[in-house]
Amino acid sequence: ILAAMSSFRNLFLATFLLAVSSIGGSAQKMRLDYKVEANIIAGGGEYTPFYLMNNRGGTVSFTPNTGYLRAAVMKDIDTTRRFSYGFGLDAMASYNDDVPAYIQQAYASLRFLALGLTVGSQEEYSLLWDKALSSGGWVWSGNSRPIPQVRIGIPEFVNFPWTHGTVQVKGEIAYGRFVDDKYQRHTHGAKENYTTGLLYHRKNLLLRFGKTNKRFYGIVGIDMAAQFGGKTYKGNKLVLDFPSDIKQYF
């Protein structure tokens, strides 16, 4: 175990130093956030307790006696500017997990006024609730690794015109692709059906009524997520081929 953790530590240091050196020349002109994290979970039983895995973005393995090392560098969007950008690179090395090392987050974001665009894999949280107090929504929860996607819309509440701040709106639309084809084939391909090339879609729209500095305000909205496209196999035999032309995107 110690030898494995030592090799993970060396890998992390190399990844972190590479990330820092690649943007070090611009560090004085922007605010960068750096993070280095270690996590170890030990115990008996067949699985890791759910409350230790919940809202962790798939970083904690369901197998017991596991751990990881994590290093990240990020720049947040500056909401005080008309135009701003952000990015993130988050690498992980794990012990007693299916994958020994992987990129957890890699994304770039642009913001112009209220409009936002994000491309890549970024951890997401509940649309409304405090991420530390909620186990997630019925539609989506943060218990799996981020899905590579393109997301565009109004990511934060903004005042709706002509309402004097009593009505705010936010909403986004996203398309992405699942990247667990090899994992599905390896774990299910021999005896069970598995799907490759699966696509992802999500859209939401929320309206907030009342001013947040008052005692009461209300929120109504809709949130929808779906999987579409892809091909289902059993072994090497094609079972189903789901359509993924332009009609399915809408």
For the regions a language model picked out, list residue spans one by one.
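Short loop/turn motifs that connect adjacent beta-strands in outer-membrane beta-barrel proteins
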Residues: 28-33, 75-86, 111-115, 157-170, ...
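Transmembrane beta-strand segments of Gram-negative outer membrane beta-barrel proteins
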Residues: 28-67, 78-89, 171-175
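Transmembrane beta-strands of outer-membrane beta-barrel pores
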Residues: 38-46, 77, 91-95, 112-114, ...
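Outer-membrane beta-barrel translocator domains and adjoining extracellular loop/strand segments
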Residues: 46-53, 98-102, 129-136, 181-190, ...
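Extracellular loop and loop/strand-boundary signature of outer-membrane beta-barrel proteins
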Residues: 55-59, 90-94, 134-140, 188-193
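Residues that define the transmembrane beta-barrel architecture of outer-membrane proteins
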Residues: 61-69, 100-104, 143-153, 197-203, ...
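Residues on the lipid-exposed face of transmembrane beta-strands in outer-membrane beta-barrel proteins
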Residues: 69-75, 106-112, 119, 150-156, ...
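Signature for the C-terminal beta-barrel architecture of outer-membrane proteins
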Residues: 155-250
